[in-house]
Amino acid sequence: MKKILILGSTGSIGTNALELIRNNREQYQVVGISGNKNIDLLKKQIEEFKPISIYVGSEQDAIYLKKEYSFIKEVYFGENGLAELSKNSDYDIILTAVSGAIGIDATVEAIKRGKRIALANKETMVSAGVYINKLLKEYPKAEIVPVDSEHSALFQSLQGFKKENLKKLIITASGGTFRGKDLAYLENVTVEQALKHPNWSMGKKITIDSSTLVNKGLEVIEAHELFNVDYDDIEVVIHPQSVIHSMVEYVDGSIIAQMGVANMKTPILYAFTYPEKEYNSSINFLDLIKNNNLTFEEADRKVLKGIDLAYRAGRTGDTMPTVFNASNEIAVELFMKKQIKFLDIYRIIEEAMNSHQVLTLNTDNALNVIKEVDREIRKKVREQWEK
């Protein structure tokens, strides 16, 4: 039986993971979960799966839950709580499904313990990829299996081939909510419009990121760090049907693609079972006859600038990807609060990147540098844009 620790159990990926486990309880045991503010759902999960360790955002909620459930041995909260949960819990696999830079420390602790990380937190590799890769070399028993559908597709399509056989990675994108729209249209789009993704059911933040194509930009940086592939050999292609989740082109002209329904359960399950594949009754199967029209097109990077900003951040390297990520996180938060317009998201990211003096990350102090830059950028954006 595999012991699973789920960070972000109340979010979209976390709830999908728990549904997979619910349908295969003889194979998996949930030893720990974490939620932030959705206490009602967290309580239901605690009652059903009976984890012995949990994390919650506030001290008040932590005290309440510890009193409420006698079987819980440890309750963590606060800024360092997720890392402590990762450091102290007894698990085989940790699913990092929290959004934001808070997931980095928890991943670091899991690597130091030689665990498998089912990675669904983009920021870990975007902001701290250089440091994480260095750490993985120091702790070779640890492994990262990506959960993001595109990176899972690339990971699967790369199995069994040498890196010198590779020509390029092709990351597919649905195009998001505003595919085909012009700048005049985007100037006044609402939060409600941006949250209507055509294919995927996801959390609010990642849905907004998909509408700006910043999400795809983050995926480009993450792919560079995960697979050690140059940015010139990573391509983004719009694929509106979201059936092909990504592809790998090889030097002999062949392209290997991973296909499936637009659902996060398959990549989550693969991260749990790798290198094997396992049936689960909650998985839906792709009907090729019904999905017989697969199309591809170029992304309109002049209108939806998230991809180009990411390539710029990634090629600059060092602390610039952290700036890209942190400024976007605050910009999306302000947009969802209706304090800025949709196109202001790009303006905020560009301003933050243009004004940043890049710091190198080739020292043992890299993680502290990343955290400090992350804090500074968030503070600066809030001061300039928050109403």
From Swiss-Prot:
Pathway: Isoprenoid biosynthesis; isopentenyl diphosphate biosynthesis via DXP pathway; isopentenyl diphosphate from 1-deoxy-D-xylulose 5-phosphate: step 1/6. Its cofactor is Mg(2+); Mn(2+). NADPH binds at T10, G11, S12, I13, K37, N38, N121, E123, G203. It catalyses: 2-C-methyl-D-erythritol 4-phosphate + NADP(+) = 1-deoxy-D-xylulose 5-phosphate + NADPH + H(+). 1-deoxy-D-xylulose 5-phosphate binds at K122, S149, E150, S174, H197, S210, N215, K216, E219. Keywords: Isoprene biosynthesis, Manganese, Metal-binding, NADP, Oxidoreductase. It comes from the Bacteria. Catalyzes the NADPH-dependent rearrangement and reduction of 1-deoxy-D-xylulose-5-phosphate (DXP) to 2-C-methyl-D-erythritol 4-phosphate (MEP). HAMAP family: DXP_reductoisom. Belongs to the DXR family. This is 1-deoxy-D-xylulose 5-phosphate reductoisomerase. It comes from Fusobacterium nucleatum subsp. nucleatum (strain ATCC 25586 / DSM 15643 / BCRC 10681 / CIP 101130 / JCM 8532 / KCTC 2640 / LMG 13131 / VPI 4355). The lineage of its organism: Bacteria, Fusobacteriati, Fusobacteriota, Fusobacteriia, Fusobacteriales.
